[in-house]
């Protein structure tokens, strides 16, 4: 069996510590029977595990089912009043550093904001502070904000750092003033914003230049929104129907390649531009840029992001 399959098996075993049938029962209790995948998916996933443990190659259908089950074990806790929700025991047993991360990330949660277009009155993505008035996001987020011109004027867009579920946004809106820089080849942009008011406890995020490693626990923080045309049914239940508000999404690094970090956090549309934190250090190891739910999620790596920021600070 190839090293890739061995790594996949290790990832699956870190997540699925019981037979798949037992995992399905736990998930059914969380999201309800109507939102569950078919029992056939569970059978195929168990076959994939059994095959890899026997040093055999599973079929593509079996692997797809196994990936589906792994993603069922990737929660999306809410941020409330500047703190992340505690994970249910079913998930905290997987992400053993979560409690420490809840504390270490607190100074940075109000530095992650939802980017809204004032012309369309829609949110288009996520951004985060890398300096007092400098916001990092994706180039394609800027493309949506600027209608493809890659230029912004005051009054076109704002960022909201306090948009949380069931918590009044006392921080208000912050105007985005202009485009500072676009990366030539990577999906990154830097935007200048107004200085957040003194009531905003905003601390610029620290970017890690050392490469993340396969299997590292990571967390995407951003503002996922609903997309009924792309999201499976269980997403509505897993997210409790609450979209467009600040959430964390724990997962792990699946693969590292040149200037990219592939991860399996539960990111949706709206997470574009989200910081990918190391769960151990609360440092940013990437900026989320793209994803296909249940297939792959991709971020630009921290070293490339740090170099880009250094050129413009």
Segments from the language model and where they lie:
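Short, solvent-exposed coil/turn linker segments
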Residues: 83, 87-98, 208-212, 274, ...
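Residue-identity detector for glutamine
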Residues: 13, 18, 41, 46-47, ...
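Protease-domain processing segments flanking chymotrypsin-fold serine proteases, especially trypsin-like
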Residues: 1-125, 245-248
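Serine endopeptidase catalytic core focused on the charge-relay Asp
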Residues: 103-124, 128-269, 277-280, 297-303
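Weak global preference for isoleucine
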Residues: 23, 27-31, 70, 94, ...
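C-terminal subregion of chymotrypsin/trypsin-like serine protease catalytic domains
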Residues: 2-18, 22, 26, 33, ...
């Amino acid at each position: 069996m190839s090293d890739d399959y061995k790594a996949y098996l290790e990832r699956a075993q870190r997540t699925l510590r019981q037979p798949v049938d037992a995992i399905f029962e736990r998930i059914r209790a969380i999201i309800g029977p109507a939102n569950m995948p078919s029992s056939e998916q569970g059978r195929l996933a168990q076959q994939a595990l059994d095959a890899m443990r026997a040093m055999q190659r599973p079929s593509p259908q079996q692997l797809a089912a196994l990936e589906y089950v792994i993603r069922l074990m990737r929660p999306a806790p809410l941020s409330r009043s500047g703190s992340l929700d505690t994970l249910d025991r079913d998930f905290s047993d997987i992400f053993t550093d979560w409690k420490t991360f809840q504390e270490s990330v607190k100074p940075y949660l109000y530095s992650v904001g939802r980017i809204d277009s004032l012309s369309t009155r829609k949110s288009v993505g996520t951004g985060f502070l890398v300096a007092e008035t400098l916001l990092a996001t994706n180039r394609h987020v800027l493309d949506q904000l600027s209608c493809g011109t890659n230029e912004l004027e005051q009054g076109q867009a704002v960022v909201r750092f306090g948009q949380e579920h069931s918590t009044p946004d006392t921080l208000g809106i912050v105007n985005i003033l202009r485009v500072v820089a676009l990366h030539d080849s990577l999906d990154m942009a830097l935007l200048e914003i107004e200085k957040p008011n003194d009531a905003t406890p905003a601390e610029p995020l620290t970017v890690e230049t050392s490469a993340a490693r396969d299997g590292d626990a990571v967390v995407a923080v951003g503002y996922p929104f609903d997309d009924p045309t792309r999201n499976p049914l269980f997403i509505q239940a897993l997210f409790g129907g609450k979209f467009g508000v600040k959430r964390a999404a724990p997962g792990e690094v699946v693969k590292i390649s040149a200037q990219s970090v592939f991860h399996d956090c539960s990111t949706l549309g709206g997470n574009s531009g989200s910081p990918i934190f190391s769960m151990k250090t609360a440092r940013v190891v990437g900026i989320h840029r793209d994803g296909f739910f249940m297939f792959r999620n991709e971020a630009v790596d921290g070293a490339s992001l740090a170099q880009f920021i250094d050129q413009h600070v």
